[in-house]
Regions:
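Start-transfer (signal-anchor) and selected internal transmembrane alpha helices
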Residues: 1-28, 189-232, 470-480, 583-590, ...
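Beta-sheet-rich sandwich/jelly-roll-like modules and their strand-loop junctions
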Residues: 21-100, 118-120, 130-136, 145-200
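Transmembrane-helix motifs of polytopic, lipid-linked glycan transferases
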Residues: 207-208, 346-372
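Transmembrane-helix signature of polytopic, membrane-embedded enzymes
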Residues: 218-221, 342-345, 364-385
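Interfacial juxtamembrane loops and adjacent helix segments
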Residues: 260-350
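Membrane-interface alpha helices of multi-pass inner-membrane proteins
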Residues: 388, 423-439, 444-450
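Perimembrane helix-loop-helix junctions
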Residues: 409-418, 442-482
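Membrane-lumen/periplasm interface segments of multi-pass, membrane-embedded glycan/lipid transferases
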Residues: 486-576
Length: 672
């Protein structure tokens, strides 16, 4: 029956949109306007990862880098370095000239001590007197020369740029880069992007109000359009490369794209073929949020690619801890962009869009399958951190969606009196996926199959038959568990071997914790786990709710986090949608989540934590997303009861809060 829409609801929608529009204007005037008329910033240096260095000294007194400037109206170049043993008479000459004609655009010679006389890294700036007109696509030569250096040594941060850098120290093809920042143009040109963002948010808000409040649709019905629209907004806000390790995931997806398109592999296992324009775009994108990425999104998405020839370049493969299947959506999107001859930016965005489609489809399937907790699962999938990962090229899009489906299947089959064959087939597939993903840290989730194989029949006259069937399935489950464990050990044996290597604790803290050491000191493990919870527990919760997005570049206010947490707790206690399992099932679910969390802690302890620390490093809230549908269901209790009629208000509160979060992220991360 069609639900009648009242005039009051139209008035409520109008007022909500009016208030949100006013907030958009307020954010612009209070936070964005004051940052206008500043140069755009392009980070050429790799961030959040290990980098190399070049030493300018008596042994190598001059460095010269020839690069293609891809930015218009170049204004300033910044180089990061640290000076050591700076001699009193040492002089440093800095020159920026045309790489072809030799015309000088910047030239300065200073005593080395004035430029840098510190053991702390510092950015040395070369600011042009006037913006360099026509700098885009111009070859430039950057030269630093040290004179009378004696013991002086400048340790300059460096990385590799495969296409943009033409030569280094006159070595053609050497992509060594020492430039940290390029500042160019004016960020005022990005105001239009903010206007489009606000328009998209208002459309999203109106759509959600219409579907949830006016039409009264269930989460199964409104989830797909809501997730797709909000996911696309997140893609524009968190551009290519701004999600942790996304460049590595794009490299891996590109490898599978080559296989889809029957591109031959290189002779070197550490290189692949890529389009020149795609490599160039990767060189232009940084590991983080910056105005340059927003500018590229605005100007390069719908352009014609300049060079689609294939070139052999180094790449990083991230498929060792996951099945290659998780990269298929992104690889398909990249392949489509290459076949259609689209720009590099649009090709990479298509990879992200296909990943988003996979995440939304898997999450929606889980919502359809799960017998209870539908609203909780939908709200979890729409959390900022879930959408950030789901709308990126990261394998987390498929991994998180796949785990959601597995948990939903276990709960569904545990509730049904008669299970279907397709459910067992699907359960086996996703159980295999669970066992062979992320180093096996989520392997304890297989305990949830107890819901399936340990359930009791509700009819007395079928008890004998049920016992026979249960025995058969328990044997099958046991065999399957052994096979899955063997597959897990086989796939992750190289990683396990590195963890199992014995190692001595180093006095300087440069070593890592190892499994043999931890086995010999079990109390040390207890202390490390406890200290981690006490010191970092608030960060885990905050980042799980979306409190630290991108490469932790944006920190969300706890005001937003409280709303998201409250929404999840209320969703777990909605009428006709709360978990109604017995005590044994709750204990099993809690044990599965606790064991997985313990393995996550252990993996980061032996794989990331220096042995001079008394807590575990590197753990983020997003690592617990695959467990969320299970452990959040345990929040259901008799003290909280949410009536069905209150569902729409809770959903709109959470979604409007997410809109406000996006506005704050745009303002604080430098969209303009």
């Amino acid at each position: 029956m069609e639900r009648k829409i009242s005039k009051i609801q139209f008035f409520q929608m109008f007022m909500l949109l009016l208030v949100t529009g006013a907030v958009c204007v307020l954010v612009y005037k209070a936070q964005i306007r004051e940052n206008l008329h500043r140069p755009l910033e392009y980070t050429m240096m790799t961030e959040h990862k290990d980098r190399g260095e070049i030493v300018l000294s008596r042994e190598m007194p001059e460095i010269s880098e020839v690069f293609t400037c891809k930015t218009p109206e170049l204004k300033k170049i910044s180089i990061e370095c640290v000076g050591k043993n700076v001699a009193a008479g040492a002089m440093l000459s800095m020159v920026l000239a045309d790489g072809e004609t030799g015309e000088v655009y910047f030239e300065e010679e200073k005593p080395a001590g004035e430029v840098l006389n510190s053991r702390i890294q510092k950015k040395v700036e070369m600011e042009l007197k006037e913006p360099l007109k026509g700098s885009e696509n111009k070859k430039l030569r950057l030269t630093w020369k040290l004179q009378n250096g004696d013991s002086t040594a400048f340790h300059i941060t460096a990385n590799q740029k495969n296409v943009i850098v033409d030569s280094f120290n006159n070595q053609k093809g050497d992509g060594t880069n020492v430039i940290y920042y390029l500042h160019y143009g004016d960020n005022t040109c990005l105001k239009g992007l903010y206007v489009l963002l606000c328009a998209a948010l208002l459309f999203f808000e109106a759509m959600c109000f219409y579907l949830i409040v006016m039409r009264g649709l269930s989460v199964e019905q409104f989830f797909v359009p809501a997730a797709l629209v909000l996911g696309l907004i997140f893609q524009c806000l968190f551009t290519v490369g701004s999600v942790p390790d996304e460049q590595t995931h794009l490299d891996t997806a590109y490898k599978f794209s080559n296989r889809m398109l029957f591109v031959e592999e290189t002779e070197n296992p550490y290189t692949i073929y890529k389009r020149v324009c795609d490599v160039e775009m990767s060189d232009m994108l940084t590991n983080g949020l910056e105005t340059n990425s927003q500018y590229l999104l605005m100007t390069e998405t719908f352009t014609e690619p300049e060079n689609t020839e294939l070139v052999e370049v180094p790449y990083q493969d991230a498929s060792s801890l996951v099945p290659g299947l998780v990269y298929m959506p992104a690889a398909a999107g990249i392949s489509l962009g290459r076949l259609l001859g689209l720009s590099a930016m649009l090709t990479l965005q298509l990879g992200r869009i296909f990943n988003l489609l996979a995440f939304v489809l898997l999450s929606w399937t889980a919502i359809r399958i799960i017998p209870f907790g539908k609203n909780l699962l939908g709200m979890t999938a729409l959390l900022p951190i879930a959408l950030q990962q789901g709308a990126s090229a990261s394998y987390d899009a498929v991994v998180n969606g796949g785990f959601f489906v597995f948990i939903a299947l276990c709960l569904r089959m545990g509730k049904e009196e008669r299970t279907k064959k397709w459910e067992f087939v699907l359960l086996g597939i996703f159980a295999l996926f669970t066992a062979t993903t992320k180093g096996g840290v989520y392997l304890p989730l297989l305990l949830l199959t107890v819901f399936v194989f340990g359930r009791n029949s509700g009819k007395k006259n079928q008890q004998e038959k049920t016992r026979k069937i249960s025995a058969k399935w328990m044997i099958t489950a046991g065999v399957l568990a052994v096979v899955l464990l063997a597959l897990c050990i086989y796939k992750f044996m190289p990683v396990m071997q590195s963890f199992l290597q014995a190692g001595d604790m180093t006095a300087d803290g440069s070593g890592m914790y190892t499994i043999p050491y931890l086995l010999a000191h079990p109390l040390k493990v207890v202390y490390l786990y406890w200290n981690t919870l006490m010191k970092r527990g608030d960060f885990f919760l905050h980042s799980f709710l979306g409190g630290a997005l991108s490469w932790l570049d944006f920190e969300m206010s706890w005001l937003f986090a409280v709303v998201f947490l409250g929404g999840l707790l209320l969703a777990a206690n909605m009428e006709e949608d709360r978990f109604v399992g017995n005590r044994k099932q709750k204990i099993c679910m809690a044990a599965a989540c606790a064991l997985s969390a313990g393995l996550i802690f252990l993996s980061m302890l032996v794989g990331y934590t220096k042995n001079n620390l008394n807590y575990i490093q590197g753990i983020q809230g997003r690592y617990f997303l695959p467990l969320a549908p299970a452990f959040l269901l345990l929040a259901g209790n008799k003290m909280i009861h949410v009536q069905r009629e209150q569902r729409a208000a809770i959903w709109m509160t959470v979604l409007v809060t997410e809109i406000l979060l996006v506005l704050q992220a745009a303002a604080m991360t430098g969209m303009v």
